Amino acid sequence: MGICRLRLNNNSILEIEIRDGEYVIDCGANVGNITSIFENAGANVIAFEPNKHAFEILQTRFVYNKKVRCFKKGVVGKNPGKRKLFMHKNNYIDEIVYSTGSSIIESKNNVNKNNYEEVEMVRLSSFIKKFNKDIKVLKIDIEGAEIELLNDLMDSGVARKIPYIFVETHEKKIPTLQKETEALRNRVKNEGYTNINLNWI
């Protein structure tokens, strides 16, 4: 058993007790820094990362670690299958550093609409139901696709079953999502989801 410490965007530290073997899903794992925190606390981690440059490092980092399963896929709330993943506009400078900014949201203000790769997307609610194991923590940092995803997790009933859900929202970089993000915040509050934190990072 270990303690996982996550810093929230108000600089407070949230401590989560992780029992050995409990499951965590890391959506938007990038090169695995948060994945590593969960794994070090004793969790089994399922890490999703669609960006090929970040995934190469992620996979190499955990290739001999049986507690971490890495998938070169993104997660969505609807329309699974192939989608365009747009690269950060500064991707040409450093493909790893700027891999954190890649997004399936074409209107994100720091992506290059002409530079993208086709990536496989899975519907997370369906994945979790088929996985059929208790999930202790769900971390979501998927550059704008979190609105669609989280609404589907709530619609499907999956969100009620996960004790800790941490989400980074991106309405500052995607102004078109401001109303949807506000609606999501209101829904989380009005429907009494105390397990969903929309202020992570």
Give the residues covered by each predicted segment:
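Phosphate/nucleotide-binding beta-alpha loop and adjacent structural elements of enzyme active sites
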Residues: 1-201
